[in-house]
């Protein structure tokens, strides 16, 4: 069935309250969009931040008369008369199919491909990781994930032990195993990430080589030849001593999840333990690599 969509321009202070009013008026869904392409980085744990300029998007059944809803909102001091809004008809679609059609196999480096399960593998003889978008972060489409995948592809991981620190979907851990690593340990603070990583490992038939832990459960003295951490600049700095002690002397490190302007300072901080390389950049993001001293 078709739908009617009401879009309202507001700010982060009023967005939730406006959404509540729209739900009371019969909206079947409420979503929030960025009104001015403003990025939000490193929200607090458990926080769902909104942009200062927020668009509240409400979806109604096609037969809904929105005039009373618009009139009600116009009386609110949050919006006022003649508040900016837009009403449009939304055609009915197979939204699941449209979502699936937006994901394609992607190549990283020279050997590695990430392929959704519903797509034909373009190069069966390549190193292929089968991964579908899901709850946990990491499908290869984000620049930080891409930077880490390209780095892993550039390494000879034969018989190496690897730690994926902040494993998310398990994409980096599974890629490392497919690229020849002997064993990979994934650590994440989110139990959903652990579950997602396990499911993806089973799908790629590498579950026997992948050990997954919440931080409080990881083995004492855990150490590896290669460590990759695609998290955020704040945790990367806070956890630097812990990360450093998990890399053997002469071992390799990759850090991502940080903005270009954060790279230089973080590289200087990690130089206490690592011989750091020049940063690599993709879009607004960066990756740091180094060798353990």
Curated annotation (Swiss-Prot):
S-adenosyl-L-methionine binds at residues 145, 166, 188, 230. CDD domains: AdoMet_MTases (cd02440). Keywords: Cytoplasm, Methyltransferase, S-adenosyl-L-methionine, Transferase. It comes from the Bacteria. The keyword Cytoplasm applies. GO terms for cellular component: cytosol. Its EC number is 2.1.1.-. Methylates ribosomal protein L11. This is Ribosomal protein L11 methyltransferase. It comes from Shewanella denitrificans (strain OS217 / ATCC BAA-1090 / DSM 15013). The gene is prmA.
């Amino acid at each position: 069935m078709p739908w009617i969509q009401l879009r309202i321009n507001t700010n982060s202070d009023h967005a939730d309250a406006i959404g509540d009013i729209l739900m009371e008026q019969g909206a079947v869904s409420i979503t929030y969009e960025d009104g001015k392409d403003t990025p939000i980085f490193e929200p607090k744990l458990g926080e769902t931040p909104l942009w200062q300029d927020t668009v509240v998007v409400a979806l109604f059944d096609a037969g809904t008369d929105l005039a009373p809803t618009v009139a009600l909102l116009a009386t609110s001091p949050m919006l006022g008369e003649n508040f900016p809004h837009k009403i449009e008809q939304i055609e009915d679609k197979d939204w699941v199919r449209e979502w699936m059609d937006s994901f394609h196999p992607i190549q990283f480096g020279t050997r590695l491909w990430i392929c959704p399960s519903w797509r034909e593998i373009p190069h069966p003889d390549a190193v292929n990781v089968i991964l579908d978008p899901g709850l946990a972060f990491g499908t290869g489409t984000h620049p930080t994930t891409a930077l880490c995948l390209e780095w892993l592809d550039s390494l000879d991981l034969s018989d190496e032990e690897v730690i994926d620190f902040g494993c998310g979907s398990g994409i980096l851990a599974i890629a490392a195993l497919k690229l020849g690593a002997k064993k990979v340990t994934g650590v994440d603070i989110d139990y959903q990430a652990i579950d997602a990583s396990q499911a993806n490992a089973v799908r790629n038939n590498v579950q026997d080589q992948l050990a997954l832990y919440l931080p409080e459960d990881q083995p004492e003295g855990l150490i590896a030849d290669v460590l990759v951490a695609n998290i955020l600049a704040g945790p990367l700095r806070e956890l630097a001593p812990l990360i450093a002690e998990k890399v053997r002397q002469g071992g390799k490190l990759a850090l991502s999840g940080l903005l270009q302007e954060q790279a230089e300072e973080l590289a200087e901080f990690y130089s206490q333990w690592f011989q750091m390389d020049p940063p690599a950049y993709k879009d607004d993001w960066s990756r740091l690599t180094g060798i353990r001293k």
